[in-house]
Amino acid sequence: MYSKLMFFFALCSISFLFTSEAASTMLLESSYLPLNQSYAPGFLYKRDMLPPPLQAVLTYTCPEPRPLAEESYNDLLRAISQKSSSDFQNAYSLALSFSSDFYQHGLKTLKDVSFLAVEKFLWGLTRLWSSLILASFSALWWLVSNFTTPVFCLALLYTVTKYMVKTVSFLFGGLPIWIISIAFSLLKKSFSALRSTPKCLYEKAIDGFKSFTIPQSPPKSCVIPITHASGNHAGYASCIKLYNGENALMTATHVLRDCPNAVAVSAKGLKTRIPLAEFKTIAKSDKGDVTLLRGPPNWEGLLGCKAANVITAANLAKCKASIYSFDRDGWVSSYAEIVGSEGTDVMVLSHTEGGHSGSPYFNGKTILGVHSGASATGNYNLMAPIPSLPGLTSPTYVFETTAPQGRVFAQEDIAEIEGLYAQVMKRVQQAEDFKPKTGKYWGDMEDDEDIFFESKEDLSGNGVRGTVRGTNGEGSSTPKTSNVDGKEMMEKIISSLVGKINLENIERKVIEEISAKAMKTPKSRRRRAPKKQPESSKDTSPRSTTGKYQPPHVRSPASVTAANCPNTTTPSKKKNLAGGRPSSGTIPRWVRKQAASAGPSSAPKQN
């Protein structure tokens, strides 16, 4: 191996020497040529006319190398180490290049072989699968064509057997389990219904509580009677104000459950009836017994009511209250009192009758809750509190105020009440997070976009004429109508009306009226005597004097000296001033009256 490397190195050095010698010879020869002739193609045909180039011979004598015996051991060892390291590096680089080439070639070959093997395998699998399918169809077709009747009988028997197996498995497997589960659920429901007692009665009069009623209308007429479709009374509802800017109808849930065809009636004498089926549910809870409804457009104006503010369960405290009901003589207000809580309901002392369900309890002009019914165990009525729904019945922000004194509900009860309406809040949040497909909300649009329809393209009429077609029968008898202008129609109507007026009769009647007024004798104008005003009676008892000074307005009339007469006189209240005679009653109105003699008038003359 070492001899081969040395031989290869010798060949490389010899080829390098020959290449360098040839290059130096070419440079020396080209240096004697002028610049304009060495590379100019035009002088090639005059080469024989040029003088021969000058020949120069360079001689260089190399010094004779020193013999190796004269070198020192250090130089010899250094030369041997350098020679061995260079030979090793050359051999290593050559081996590394050979190994890298072999690795690249082997990797490429392996890759090509693997791709080819996978491709052949997939194609073989495809051919095998297609062959099996084709063989199956061929065999099936051979059986059907040669043994048609037995094959159809076998298919029918297979179908019947399959459905029989399913029926047997259901009868002996799923059916008993289904029957047992239904029986167990019925027993459980009946047992729970027998054990559970009703939470509240619909109406109740509280024993020992003194109440009074006064004729009074609800605040803002926000209480609305609810009736059945037949017109019989069912309960009450109220119009409340929400924090999203809308007005909602609030009532008890059991009123809507017991009266599916309920109708809201105006209590202000308006003959307006709105079915509650046209209202959409905003929030509802069977256990909380409060339902909020969104009405059709302008339902408040149709029922003649305005929205009132509400107090949620988190801010409810013990206080005095009032409940309204509609009697034969009109609205009456009954006294009530909130005393505490029972679970998620509020204990109220009040006297109620049948049909009061859904009526709100007020404290001033604010709604506290909805009348739900009477307690089945205690001596009090129950009021359903209004849940705190952020964005609906309560604001989305938090007030920086202290807690209300005498709060009815604890924090756990408030959380339980809000949990009853958790599903409602999910729907509200989904509505808030709604994003249209276009990404642009209707409320954010400044103006509605105009819709332009494509008009029919106007044809020039210069195309190729169609075939002339003759009529096969008589023409159409439908007369052609032309559009009449409205202005022309009005002119025709006015001209026809003017033509019917008889001017001669009008002139005759005018002359008769004027002559009758001119021949009338004027009536005598007599003055009426002014009415005499009754004089006030004089004081019968004179004032007592003590000898002290009394102001003039306190002194008696007898003690006052007579005052001097003023220089001027009070003008007369009569219409005619002094110096002028009253006009005679027989003088007509158009005759000029005599001027007054009090002097010339200072007013400007009229034109």
Curated annotation (Swiss-Prot):
Q: Where is the active site?
A: 254 (for protease activity), 289 (for protease activity), 357 (for protease activity)
Its function, per the record, reads:
Precursor from which the VPg molecule is probably released at the onset of the RNA synthesis. Essential for virus replication.
Family, according to the entry, reads as follows: Belongs to the peptidase S39B family.
Write out the ranges of the annotated region (Disordered).
Answer: 457-485, 517-607
**Which residues are in the Peptidase S39 domain?**
206-400
Q: How is the protein altered post-translationally, as described in the entry?
A: Specific enzymatic cleavages in vivo yield mature proteins. The protease probably cleaves itself and releases the VPg protein.
Q: Which GO terms describe its biological process?
A: proteolysis; viral translational frameshifting
Give an example GO molecular function. serine-type endopeptidase activity
Comp. bias intervals (Polar residues): 474-484, 558-571
EC number of the protein: 3.4.21.-
User: Which keywords label this protein?
Assistant: Hydrolase, Membrane, Protease, RNA-binding, Serine protease, Signal, Transmembrane, Transmembrane helix
Q: Name one GO cellular component term.
A: membrane
Its source organism is: Turnip yellows virus (isolate FL-1)
Domain description from the entry?
A: The C-terminus part of protein P1 and VPg/P1-C25 displays RNA-binding properties.
Where is there biased composition of kind Basic and acidic residues? Answer: 532-541
Where is the chain membrane-spanning? 115-135, 137-157, 167-187
List the InterPro entries hit by this protein, alphabetically: Luteovirus_Orf2, Peptidase_S1_PA, Peptidase_S1_PA_chymotrypsin, Peptidase_S39B_luteovirus
Tell me what this protein is called: Protein P1
Basic residues bias: start-end ranges: 520-531
Residues at the site labelled Cleavage: 203-204, 400-401
